Amino acid sequence: MAYVLVGFMGVGKTTIGNLLARKLGLKFIDIDEQIELEMNMKIKDIFEQYGETYFRTLEHNILKQHINMNIVLATGGGIIENPNNISLLKENKINIWVDTNINTVYNRIVNDVNRPNAMNKSFDAIKDLYFRRRSRYNEIAYISVNNDDELSDCVQEIHNFIIAEEGN
């Protein structure tokens, strides 16, 4: 069973996932990084050449391949755009929704050329997407954590939760 990090782009899933995996002594896989590795292309180039639908299929295949492994797995913010992913994630025991303030998110992603769904978007457009996705993150989350403050506190909160769950 994977410990799956879900949440909007720019909330810190990859950074948290790396730290959490080290703390738990597990392998860490970031789905976006895995796609880039397998395709030998950047996400933005996959979007440009093949489109979002193709990217979402790749994303689903990576999720399906790794969700039953004992790892920490970071998803892309749009993982919940595919209903098949929602189904897979609902079957997984521990999905961790990482959230943070929309202003913080916007400042992190607004000029990031590696985020095709954020490039050249206004604050209102990003905010609309953020709020549209929130209910789906909540639907699949077993626990939610806020990454507004210290990163180490967020990682420790998740770690404590996992240790407590393993004891039950």
From Swiss-Prot:
Q: Which InterPro entries match?
A: P-loop_NTPase, Shikimate/glucono_kinase, Shikimate_kinase/TSH1, Shikimate_kinase_CS
Locations listed in the record: Cytoplasm
Q: Which reaction does it catalyse?
A: shikimate + ATP = 3-phosphoshikimate + ADP + H(+)
Q: Which Pfam families match?
A: SKI
- What cofactor does its activity depend on? Mg(2+)
Q: Which GO terms describe its biological process?
A: amino acid biosynthetic process; aromatic amino acid family biosynthetic process; chorismate biosynthetic process
Superkingdom per UniProt: Bacteria
Enzyme Commission code: 2.7.1.71
- Please state what class of enzyme this protein is: transferase
Q: In which pathway does it act?
A: Metabolic intermediate biosynthesis; chorismate biosynthesis; chorismate from D-erythrose 4-phosphate and phosphoenolpyruvate: step 5/7
How and how many cofactors are bound, per the record note? Binds 1 Mg(2+) ion per subunit.
Q: Do you know which PROSITE patterns this protein is assigned to?
A: SHIKIMATE_KINASE (PS01128)
Would the keyword rRNA-binding turn up in this protein's UniProt record?
no
Where does this protein hold Mg(2+)? T14
Q: What HAMAP family does its record include?
A: Shikimate_kinase
Q: What does the UniProt function comment say about this protein?
A: Catalyzes the specific phosphorylation of the 3-hydroxyl group of shikimic acid using ATP as a cosubstrate.
What is its quaternary makeup? Monomer.
Q: Which family does it belong to?
A: Belongs to the shikimate kinase family.
Q: What is this protein called?
A: Shikimate kinase
Species the sequence originates in = Macrococcus caseolyticus (strain JCSC5402)
Q: Which gene encodes it?
A: aroK
